[in-house]
């Protein structure tokens, strides 16, 4: 099918994924947009989607269309569609939605597929030999959850509505009455030991017999062991001794055994650590309001807020460094000099009556003319 043609599209909501090279040719992009209803068609750039700058809504689109680049090939598209991008595209498809390309040459309902000239593997591909990038894209699409339908198109499977199915468990009726008539229940025999529990009796009798003795008389047991049980035991209840090891020694594992411990750091590779964190829309900060991070934050908002707090704290500590006074900034006050009083003349009355420049600020009230001395940092009047 020539690149200028586009297969007929059905009704529904469409998503067009355009490579960045197509944005430099607006005439081609406008021609493609003109083939679809604008009110039911969305356009996204693959490079923005790959960088995590935009996110796709879930279960919204009926058809996702991959556009070819400016060179009319899908090479640029395959290079940008990574595993994470493809998983987001699959999540945005409705159940039964289709993933198509513009020309339907690699998959889809092209003329080769419709005529039954697909590849020998029967997966709906075209008759031409696929390149490594095309085959890798098909494999990633299958791993993301897409399947090939009867027409050879990549589709999201529709599993239908899930509902709970009640399960009715069968129950044997009158098991004890049919066996003994008195409500007693016989447990399965093991190693020639038969265990019988009585409904009204307060004892459980364990009897071991041989085949010859049983044929001679059923009333003469070889060995009889009687264990007293609480009289409140309900009918038809048996007891199992879980402490019995049946002759097999039990090996206790040491507490310091770390054979089954898994290092979580080994589960993430360099590719996973370098991937861009996609922040959910509800965690994105709004203008004029600072959003608090969740307790188990995994989108990176908690680390971002902690980094901002550390930067603010560092700037505040730098601005509030210890104030160092130079010699010119110091002033010496000698209280022994006679006649040195404030301009208000109320120095002896106390701080409440002294002016701002009074040399006696901080000293208690004293009598006018009284000598003031300082001994061991204490005021002596």
UniProtKB/Swiss-Prot annotation:
<feature type="region of interest" description="Linker">
    <location>
        <begin position="166"/>
        <end position="273"/>
    </location>
</feature>
<feature type="region of interest" description="N-terminal SAM-like domain">
    <location>
        <begin position="8"/>
        <end position="165"/>
    </location>
</feature>
<feature type="region of interest" description="Fe-S binding site B">
    <location>
        <begin position="344"/>
        <end position="358"/>
    </location>
</feature>
<dbReference type="GO" id="GO:0046872">
    <property type="term" value="F:metal ion binding"/>
</dbReference>
<comment type="function">
    <text>Component of the cytosolic iron-sulfur (Fe-S) protein assembly (CIA) machinery required for the maturation of extramitochondrial Fe-S proteins. Part of an electron transfer chain functioning in an early step of cytosolic Fe-S biogenesis, facilitating the de novo assembly of a [4Fe-4S] cluster on the scaffold complex CFD1-NBP35. Electrons are transferred to DRE2 from NADPH via the FAD- and FMN-containing protein TAH18.</text>
</comment>
<feature type="binding site">
    <location>
        <position position="347"/>
    </location>
    <ligand>
        <name>[4Fe-4S] cluster</name>
    </ligand>
</feature>
<dbReference type="InterPro" id="IPR031838">
    <property type="entry name" value="Dre2_N"/>
</dbReference>
<feature type="binding site">
    <location>
        <position position="294"/>
    </location>
    <ligand>
        <name>[2Fe-2S] cluster</name>
    </ligand>
</feature>
<dbReference type="GO" id="GO:0016226">
    <property type="term" value="P:iron-sulfur cluster assembly"/>
</dbReference>
<dbReference type="InterPro" id="IPR007785">
    <property type="entry name" value="Anamorsin"/>
</dbReference>
<feature type="region of interest" description="Disordered">
    <location>
        <begin position="100"/>
        <end position="134"/>
    </location>
</feature>
<feature type="binding site">
    <location>
        <position position="344"/>
    </location>
    <ligand>
        <name>[4Fe-4S] cluster</name>
    </ligand>
</feature>
<feature type="binding site">
    <location>
        <position position="299"/>
    </location>
    <ligand>
        <name>[2Fe-2S] cluster</name>
    </ligand>
</feature>
<feature type="binding site">
    <location>
        <position position="355"/>
    </location>
    <ligand>
        <name>[4Fe-4S] cluster</name>
    </ligand>
</feature>
<keyword id="KW-0479">Metal-binding</keyword>
<dbReference type="Pfam" id="PF05093">
    <property type="entry name" value="CIAPIN1"/>
</dbReference>
<keyword id="KW-0411">Iron-sulfur</keyword>
<keyword id="KW-0408">Iron</keyword>
<keyword id="KW-0963">Cytoplasm</keyword>
<dbReference type="GO" id="GO:0051537">
    <property type="term" value="F:2 iron, 2 sulfur cluster binding"/>
</dbReference>
<feature type="binding site">
    <location>
        <position position="283"/>
    </location>
    <ligand>
        <name>[2Fe-2S] cluster</name>
    </ligand>
</feature>
<dbReference type="InterPro" id="IPR046408">
    <property type="entry name" value="CIAPIN1"/>
</dbReference>
<keyword id="KW-0496">Mitochondrion</keyword>
<dbReference type="GO" id="GO:0005758">
    <property type="term" value="C:mitochondrial intermembrane space"/>
</dbReference>
<dbReference type="Pfam" id="PF16803">
    <property type="entry name" value="DRE2_N"/>
</dbReference>
<feature type="region of interest" description="Fe-S binding site A">
    <location>
        <begin position="283"/>
        <end position="299"/>
    </location>
</feature>
<feature type="binding site">
    <location>
        <position position="358"/>
    </location>
    <ligand>
        <name>[4Fe-4S] cluster</name>
    </ligand>
</feature>
<keyword id="KW-0001">2Fe-2S</keyword>
<feature type="short sequence motif" description="Cx2C motif 2">
    <location>
        <begin position="355"/>
        <end position="358"/>
    </location>
</feature>
<dbReference type="GO" id="GO:0051539">
    <property type="term" value="F:4 iron, 4 sulfur cluster binding"/>
</dbReference>
<feature type="binding site">
    <location>
        <position position="297"/>
    </location>
    <ligand>
        <name>[2Fe-2S] cluster</name>
    </ligand>
</feature>
<feature type="compositionally biased region" description="Low complexity">
    <location>
        <begin position="108"/>
        <end position="118"/>
    </location>
</feature>
<keyword id="KW-0004">4Fe-4S</keyword>
<dbReference type="GO" id="GO:0009055">
    <property type="term" value="F:electron transfer activity"/>
</dbReference>
<comment type="similarity">
    <text>Belongs to the anamorsin family.</text>
</comment>
<feature type="compositionally biased region" description="Gly residues">
    <location>
        <begin position="119"/>
        <end position="128"/>
    </location>
</feature>
<protein>
    <recommendedName>
        <fullName>Fe-S cluster assembly protein DRE2</fullName>
    </recommendedName>
</protein>
<feature type="short sequence motif" description="Cx2C motif 1">
    <location>
        <begin position="344"/>
        <end position="347"/>
    </location>
</feature>
<comment type="subunit">
    <text>Monomer. Interacts with TAH18. Interacts with MIA40.</text>
</comment>
